[in-house]
């Protein structure tokens, strides 16, 4: 079993180009505040292509590669292949249950804050058809519920509270992509403690974290005071991130009892939002910290 101190952080430079529609950040906030109230259900939002919870239902190969890479990483740092796993925030696709089963996982949990995953069985049939023939033959693809049951997989949809259903020390691996930044700031320490509770000794977790604002891929979310940003008016409008920076997230995970190693960091070549526009305390942070757009962190429970 490799030591986390052996992990070398890969450093990348992110292109400075914005993401999303070419609309000013403040106009996006105004539109999202209105639309979040006009379209309260996820189904209606998804029909209009709004407030989507990921796009892995359209990026099957990207999804497969992520799951396979995380399982391989666990084998190196967790001491044994993963048999029981949890994905936090599966979003639009429950394909992780299929990809993991193909790699020997026998118990899968998937947890989200709502029921966002597609029930379109064409996606899952396509995934199953690309996997080992024996696995494909035993997966029941009648509907989403029977598929999950045939994979010994459980889909939880009430957020952190639903993690209480997972027994202490029962997991080998926890994984997520662009999830930790969406956990409410006041709930982050509790989620970290829950992850520590659920993992066995020697178990690992891997999280990809996106620190860009969800308004165009800059730092416009750091323009607001904590009182304004954390208010329900903005926090419930579909673009909330907790604004914890890389150093704070890693420190919170270590405080929960984890060993931690940052596996990669992608930085902007320069600040995408002027420092003078940022609210306190963000405007006083070191530039190297503010320029981190996204990163990966590997955890292990001693």
Walk through the language-model features, giving the residues of each.
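A short acidic, Gly/Pro-enriched loop at the edge of an enzyme's catalytic core
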Residues: 161-174
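Acceptor-substrate binding/catalytic loop of class I
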Residues: 230-247
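A C-terminal cap/extension of S-adenosyl-L-methionine-dependent methyltransferases
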Residues: 251-254, 260-302
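A short SAM/SAH-binding and catalytic strip from SAM-dependent methyltransferases
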Residues: 172-186
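Class I SAM-dependent methyltransferase SAM/SAH-binding core
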Residues: 95-162
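Conserved class I S-adenosyl-L-methionine
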Residues: 81-92, 204-229
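A short glycine-rich, Lys/Arg-flanked "PGG" loop and its adjoining helix->strand segment in the class I
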Residues: 189-201
